[in-house]
Amino acid sequence: DCVLHNHPYKGASHSPDIAVVMPVFSNEKLIGFSANTAHHVDIGAATPGLIIDVPDMWAEGMLLDAVKLYEGGKRVEPLWKYIKDNTRVPGLVMGDLEAQIASAELGVKRFEELLSKYGKDDVITACNQLMDYTEKMMRAEIEKIPDGDYKAEGFLDDDGRDRSKTLPIKVCVKIRGSEVEVDLTGSSEQVPTAFNVPFDGSTKVAAFFVFRAMLLDTYSSNEYIPQNEGSFRPIKVKAPLGSIFNPIAPAAAEARFCQIQRMADLVIKALGPVIPEKSTAGNAATLSFAAYSGVRPSGDYWVFLEVNE
């Protein structure tokens, strides 16, 4: 089987990021998954490329809620046709999906090779040990930070529609022993455009990322720390339901770039006074896109995205 998923209220980072997930079996028992995510240039939203000023998540384009593109090794042709018919650039999107599938298939193959070489029990044990090890290292770094509540505030220029209203962002980093909570209470309420952030797929992930980058950076650490779920375990994230970082469906949540960068920047700012050696200066905390599109003389649509950081 091959599953597609991009639903912003069910774990996806935002709707253009489509995940391809394939199961891995051992003796007909499910033991894991091979998965990847890719940003797709156009998924049939209200405007070509990327969007901001739209009323709800349905205007973001195709919402794929863990649907099967392959089942039992066979293509689910109606879904392939649906995707092809609902993007402005089917050649690009279908080609990228095929590449994702090939990547996931390679992951399944490599996983199966490990199982064949070492046996299921040893592979699963090793995976768990690696996650436990990374968790242990993350907790050890958190424990070096004095207990306390560390706060920082910032803002976003606007929601893409009402240019007269800035959006407050407030961060409180609560350190308690080997655990940390990032509390976003006081940040802007959700907005009526796509300038909201999927909580599970982006808000929480931004918090996981910033602590990994600050405390277990690959280049500054003295030893190799595996990248895995273990580093997430000591970190909790709190954002009031109905806020920009935890919107209520069906609010649009496609344009979530600047918000999570501002949030990460404020976490660093909050902790700067107590761990200055691991903190960076403030950054632009923004990401801008320019989307170009049109119709060729042949009648084919074209879409091009330029990313500026």
Question: Where are these predicted regions, by residue range?
Answer:
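Glycine/proline-enriched, intrinsically flexible loops and inter-domain linkers
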Residues: 1-181, 185-309
